[in-house]
């Protein structure tokens, strides 16, 4: 397909309403999501996961957005109000928060399709030609205008963004599809234990990214039909897509960069994947460029002083090497290597931090040694604590240790007051 004109793209994005599904817990993240929804989880030194699909919308020119919330949504809603509440409805801009409120029945959101169905009246009031359904819990940068143009030019009623994923990663985790030579979807399974491999690559399969484009009236018709089906689980992957691919044009859209290569996309749904995706950012040329001025990631920014590194004495030098250190941090006579320090982190003298993710407001007292760990927001790690060097001792103290050796520490595990 030739490159569409800017005016054509502008018309498409103006005619589109984006609905971001941000109500999930992310149970595979264990205690890290005990007090927050997965889309509210911190990422990349200063952002939250929800900032990525929201920024993609704004950068793509889509400025009518709804965010569906449900599980422990207070911190997510607070972030949205503070960071995304500046849009002006009279200019055709809005980020609306849509909490589960039993709008069309006596039930809360029962699945991804039901979350959209219960907000049909709100979507209809916007009079869009197209509706984008977006997952609120993945990390990636994507120009949604391209998938919109592909959707219209292909004559699809529904388009599913996809990318090749290793079989072992997709098993039980992603929707998997099979397509013909034109990328029309022939089969779709939601989170199969034995995914169907690609014809030309038995090690990978074609996985859904959880992002969909619909013709609006087609979406409404099939949501209403699904709502009347007592056997439905009210889910796009389990019910809607399998029910429409036989009789309607439903196409896959491969997510790739300008060179045709597979683009960056991370599902940070486990502690290991969350840790690894953050660790990728400390490399000299990370796969995700957070410094791209042409595609900025927007977020709420608290007014904080600059990061500070103090003390230069023998065995007591405040330094950070191959690390990301955010505003308000103080590295006082400590060494931080290959780590991310979110805002307001304070690491005291003689402590050593390596390959770790320190979420906001963490304080590491003196003489601590921490390696390959995730320290949750607000943790105060006592003086002399050693984490990540002996996993048997870590488990004995109540810390969670993953199969790949990442140690999670939360306030409850340290006996501190709990909150979001």
Swiss-Prot record:
Pathway, per record: Glycan biosynthesis; glycogen biosynthesis
Give the GO terms filed under biological process for this record. glycogen biosynthetic process
Annotated InterPro entries: ADP-Glc_PPase, ADP_Glu_pyroP_CS, GlgC_bac, GlmU/GlgC-like_hexapep, NTP_transferase_dom, Nucleotide-diphossugar_trans, Trimer_LpxA-like_sf
Q: Which domain of life is it from?
A: Bacteria
Record field: catalytic activity = alpha-D-glucose 1-phosphate + ATP + H(+) = ADP-alpha-D-glucose + diphosphate
PROSITE patterns in the record, alphabetically? ADP_GLC_PYROPHOSPH_1 (PS00808), ADP_GLC_PYROPHOSPH_2 (PS00809), ADP_GLC_PYROPHOSPH_3 (PS00810)
Query: CDD domains per the record?
Result: ADP_Glucose_PP, LbH_G1P_AT_C
- What Gene3D superfamilies does its record include? Hexapeptide repeat proteins, Spore Coat Polysaccharide Biosynthesis Protein SpsA, Chain A
What residues does alpha-D-glucose 1-phosphate bind to? 109, 175, 190-191, 208
Q: Name one GO molecular function term.
A: glucose-1-phosphate adenylyltransferase activity
Q: Which UniProt keywords apply?
A: ATP-binding, Carbohydrate metabolism, Glycogen biosynthesis, Glycogen metabolism, Nucleotide-binding, Nucleotidyltransferase, Transferase
Enzyme class label: transferase
EC number of the protein? 2.7.7.27
Q: What Pfam family does this protein match (any one)?
A: Hexapep_GlmU
Complexes and interactors: Homotetramer.
Q: What does this protein do?
A: Involved in the biosynthesis of ADP-glucose, a building block required for the elongation reactions to produce glycogen. Catalyzes the reaction between ATP and alpha-D-glucose 1-phosphate (G1P) to produce pyrophosphate and ADP-Glc.
Checking HAMAP family in the record gives: GlgC
What family is this?
Belongs to the bacterial/plant glucose-1-phosphate adenylyltransferase family.
- Protein name as it appears in the record: Glucose-1-phosphate adenylyltransferase 2
- This protein's species is Pseudoalteromonas atlantica (strain T6c / ATCC BAA-1087)
**Gene expressing this chain:** glgC2
């Amino acid at each position: 397909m030739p490159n569409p004109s800017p005016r054509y793209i502008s018309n498409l994005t103006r005619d589109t309403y984006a609905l971001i599904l941000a109500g999930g817990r992310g149970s595979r993240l264990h205690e890290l999501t005990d007090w927050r929804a997965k889309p509210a989880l911190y990422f990349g030194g200063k952002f939250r996961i929800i900032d990525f699909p929201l920024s993609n919308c704004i950068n793509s020119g889509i400025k009518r957005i709804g965010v569906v919330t449900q599980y422990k949504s207070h911190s997510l809603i607070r972030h949205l109000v503070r960071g995304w509440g500046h849009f002006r409805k009279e200019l055709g801009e809005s980020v609306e928060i849509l909490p589960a409120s039993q709008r069309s029945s006596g039930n809360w959101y029962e699945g991804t399709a039901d979350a959209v169905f219960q907000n049909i009246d709100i979507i209809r009031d916007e009079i869009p030609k197209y509706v984008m359904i977006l997952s609120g819990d993945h990390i990636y940068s994507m120009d949604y205008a391209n998938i919109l143009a592909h959707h219209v030019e292909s004559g699809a009623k529904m388009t599913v963004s996809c990318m090749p994923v290793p079989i072992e990663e997709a098993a039980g985790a992603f929707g998997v599809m099979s397509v013909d030579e034109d990328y029309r979807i022939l089969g779709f399974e939601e989170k199969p234990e034995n995914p169907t491999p690609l014809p030309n690559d038995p090690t990978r399969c074609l996985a859904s990214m959880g992002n969909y484009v619909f013709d609006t009236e087609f979406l409404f018709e099939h949501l209403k039909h699904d709502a009347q089906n007592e056997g439905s689980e009210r889910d796009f992957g389990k019910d809607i897509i399998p029910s429409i691919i036989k009789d309607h044009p439903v196409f896959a859209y491969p997510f790739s960069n300008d060179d045709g290569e597979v683009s960056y996309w991370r599902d940070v749904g486990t502690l290991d994947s969350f840790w690894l995706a953050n660790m990728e950012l400390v490399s000299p040329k990370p796969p995700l460029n957070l410094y791209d001025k042409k595609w900025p990631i927007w977020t709420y920014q608290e007014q904080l002083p600059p990061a500070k590194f103090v003390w230069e004495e023998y065995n007591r030098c405040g330094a950070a090497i191959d690390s990301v250190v955010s505003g308000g941090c103080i590295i006082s006579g400590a060494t931080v290597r290959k780590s991310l320090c979110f805002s307001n982190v304070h690491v005291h003298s003689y402590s050593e931090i390596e390959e770790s993710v320190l979420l906001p407001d963490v304080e590491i007292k003196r003489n601590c040694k921490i390696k390959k760990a995730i320290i949750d927001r607000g943790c105060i790690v006592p003086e002399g604590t050693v984490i990540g060097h002996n996993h048997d001792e870590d488990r004995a103290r109540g810390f969670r240790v993953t199969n790949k050796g990442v140690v999670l520490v939360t306030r409850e595990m340290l006996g501190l007051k709990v909150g979001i």
